[in-house]
Amino acid sequence: REIEYEVHDGIFKAFCDRAGTPIGSGTSADLGIGKSPAIWKVSLEGTGDNPTRTECMQNNHIRIGWDDYGETISDATDYSKDGGRTVLNAFYNRMQIGDIVMSCYSSKTIDAIGVVTGEPEWHDEYQHYKRLRNVQWLVKGINEDIVDFNAGKPMTLSSVYRLSVSVSDAL
């Protein structure tokens, strides 16, 4: 008896297909996705609707906090009081241009998928969540359950972390 497999499009491909109008022109539109992109979960001021999420969607970027550490993060930064070392290391050093970000709307759902297009920046004009990276949103305003996609696990509260999903699984 032979083993049979059903092939299905991945959740990321389905999101992109539903995004509507193609970005760029033709079938070879460059979405800016890197050759070996990591996939990141990003919380925009926590979960649910909020002013930071709305502003980020309108202006094509992601923002995180840890503002009390100031603009410059270095090896000398003392994380003993407020923590944040892992999140800030991910945002500044591990996340790369061309990586994919998924905006966490709840512990089980995402509301947007984008591609990182910029290096980390500090924006003092914001009262909170001053650390920013530019992104190109591929799809916004969705409400997709990704628990199955994320190995059966809900997302955690951490502001930024790499999802343990390969790009081939996502596509």
Q: What are these regions, as identified by a protein language model?
A:
Residues V42, I113-G114:
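GIY-YIG nuclease signature motif recognition
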Residues R1-L31, D145-L171:
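C-terminal interaction surface of TIR/SEFIR-family domains
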Residues R94-Q96:
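Short, well-ordered loop/turn sites that connect or cap secondary structure elements
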Residues G20-A90:
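Compositionally biased, charged N-terminal/linker segments
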Residues R1, T109, V115-V165:
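Aromatic- and Lys/Arg-enriched surface recognition patch
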